Swiss-Prot record:
UniProt KW RNA-binding keyword: no
Molecular function GO terms recorded: imidazoleglycerol-phosphate dehydratase activity
Localisation per UniProt entry: Cytoplasm
Enzyme Commission numbers on file: 4.2.1.19
Lineage of source species: Bacteria, Pseudomonadati, Pseudomonadota, Betaproteobacteria, Nitrosomonadales
Catalytic activity: D-erythro-1-(imidazol-4-yl)glycerol 3-phosphate = 3-(imidazol-4-yl)-2-oxopropyl phosphate + H2O
BP terms from Gene Ontology: L-histidine biosynthetic process
Top-level taxon: Bacteria
Protein family per UniProt: Belongs to the imidazoleglycerol-phosphate dehydratase family.
Xref: PROSITE patterns: IGP_DEHYDRATASE_1, IGP_DEHYDRATASE_2
Organism: Methylobacillus flagellatus (strain ATCC 51484 / DSM 6875 / VKM B-1610 / KT)
UniProt name for this protein: Imidazoleglycerol-phosphate dehydratase
GO cellular component annotations of the record: cytoplasm
Length: 198
């Protein structure tokens, strides 16, 4: 029987108080309360398209702006992801996904490598989506990458609507994560690296 791949992480600073939980083998259920509506909508895309159960509770310094909230949720989710993944034996490790939404198309390629790295190539067509600063999209992914220790390439290949650009990115990220953490029946108990470690 496969061990449960889930984890909980709490992170408390002077800027945010966060509790997150993740189940890598879930059904796409999310309970999200970051205090930032658009961000919750994007996190829901990761859960639904990644078939992961994700819970986020955050009290942040939103009287300043959403920067600390979004970045710190990325950090906490990255920590929870790494913890839930465990020793990484048997996973497929590499994955990619293309996701369209009307005129927008994004590609996400990732490697659960043990080496944090983000290549974020997105030129949003406007600076804000409602009240949400689009610069925070890369801040979320940088926080996640640094603490999940994955290599992540995000490219928005085309798009005119900034909401569509963001949504295709998060959907593709969820789908790529789902494929990368999938257990390969031919790799049971085997580390997916010629080095023998990740």
């Amino acid at each position: 029987m496969t061990a449960m791949r889930n984890a909980e992480v709490s992170r408390n600073t002077l800027e945010t108080k966060i509790a997150v939980a993740i189940n890598l083998d879930g059904t796409g259920i999310s309970r999200l309360n970051s205090g930032v509506g658009f961000f919750d909508h994007m996190l829901d895309q990761i859960a639904r398209h990644g078939m992961m159960d994700i819970s986020v509770e955050c009290q942040g310094d939103l009287h300043i702006d959403a920067h600390h909230t979004v970045e710190d949720v990325g950090i906490a989710l990255g920590q929870a992801f790494s913890k839930a993944l465990g020793d990484k034996k048997g996973i497929r490790r590499y994955a990619h996904a293309y996701v369209p939404l009307d005129e927008a198309l994004s590609r996400v390629v990732l490697d659960i490598s043990g080496r944090p790295g983000l290549e974020f190539n997105v030129e949003f067509t406007r600076a804000r989506i409602g009240e949400f600063d689009v610069d925070l999209v890369s801040e979320f992914f940088q926080g996640f990458v640094n603490h999940a220790a994955i290599t992540l390439h995000i490219d928005n290949l085309r798009g005119k609507n900034a909401h569509h650009q963001a949504e295709t990115i998060f959907k593709a990220f969820g789908r790529a994560l789902r494929a990368a953490v999938e257990l390969d029946p031919r790799m049971v108990g085997i580390m997916p690296s010629t080095k023998g470690s990740l």
